[in-house]
Amino acid sequence: MITVNEKEHILEQKYRPSTIDECILPAFDKETFKSITSKGKIPHIILHSPSPGTGKTTVAKALCHDVNADMMFVNGSDCKIDFVRGPLTNFASAASFDGRQKVIVIDEFDRSGLAESQRHLRSFMEAYSSNCSIIITANNIDGIIKPLQSRCRVITFGQPTDEDKIEMMKQMIRRLTEICKHEGIAIADMKVVAALVKKNFPDFRKTIGELDSYSSKGVLDAGILSLVTNDRGAIDDVLESLKNKDVKQLRALAPKYAADYSWFVGKLAEEIYSRVTPQSIIRMYEIVGENNQYHGIAANTELHLAYLFIQLACEMQWK
């Protein structure tokens, strides 16, 4: 049984685990978190994992769910000094109406420019510890000042043993299968699901994101398997359309390659390099580099890739 939030449409959010039991974690990590929830109270915690998509934010929210805490969620980038003194202080200082423990989750508090907020949080944690706990998530533990680390239980997780890896991948395959069933996505070849999990492990967030992209036609079949397993072959269709300045065809090709942008953009630059004039090589790297820089914040990755195609089609001089 998996949690389904019907208010969400992005699969990663729609099927985010809500309990520690539902989270896919190394056995030792899961026992650590279950021992915390069994006590009914959450201490000050720093959840640290250098790998993205391993579940730091999900675990933080699941801990709060499992102890029925009154949770306030804050993006680390928003947690400036005035925010700590204002909204965070107001939340932590007020008693919960129903007597529940209050917990503030500060997500990715290791970002640059937050040292002043971190220093102020030291006294904040001590002042309101009887009423409110803090959970901090961080990719880089060095981004959290030492005095703050000393006031928290630092839990570094996402480091599975070989046995853990096998079990976690099995759990993820079962989870993806359940998601496909709920979404009405036909699995014509289970090798696709297994390949998705193996390719992205331990980044389960990316795994579900790619499932969302690859399943846009409602089926996972052998045709998609070659994309997932890196057996992608040539990109002659794109190169030919770029040479011909075929904007309509380039727009049609964008969905095919948007799902694996990081591989594709490198392959595209590699292929174009030997096919254009020396003057165009510099401009090609400028265009591709800028597109790559802003890919992470693009609202629609297919349109983002189509824009790259059109720029290259208009500006490249082919040999």
Swiss-Prot record:
ATP binds at residues 12-15, 24, 53-58, 205. Gene3D superfamilies: 1.10.8.60, 1.20.272.10, P-loop containing nucleotide triphosphate hydrolases. Pfam families: AAA, Gp44_C, Gp44_lid. One of its GO terms (molecular function) is DNA binding. Its EC number is 3.6.4.-. It comes from the Viruses. It is an enzyme of class 3 (hydrolase). Keywords: ATP-binding, DNA replication, DNA-binding, Hydrolase, Nucleotide-binding, Viral DNA replication. One of its GO terms (biological process) is DNA repair. Forms the sliding-clamp-loader together with the small subunit. Functions as an ATPase enzyme. The clamp loader holds the clamp in an open conformation and places it onto the DNA. 4 ATP molecules must bind to the sliding-clamp-loader before the latter can open the sliding clamp. ATP hydrolysis triggers the detachment of the sliding clamp from the sliding-clamp-loader, freeing the sliding clamp to track along DNA. The sliding-clamp-loader consists of 4 large subunits and 1 small subunit. Interacts with the sliding clamp; this interaction allows the sliding-clamp-loader to open the sliding clamp. Part of the replicase complex that includes the DNA polymerase, the polymerase clamp, the clamp loader complex, the single-stranded DNA binding protein, the primase, the helicase and the helicase assembly factor. Belongs to the Tevenvirinae sliding-clamp-loader large subunit family. This is Sliding-clamp-loader large subunit. It comes from Enterobacteria phage T4 (Bacteriophage T4).
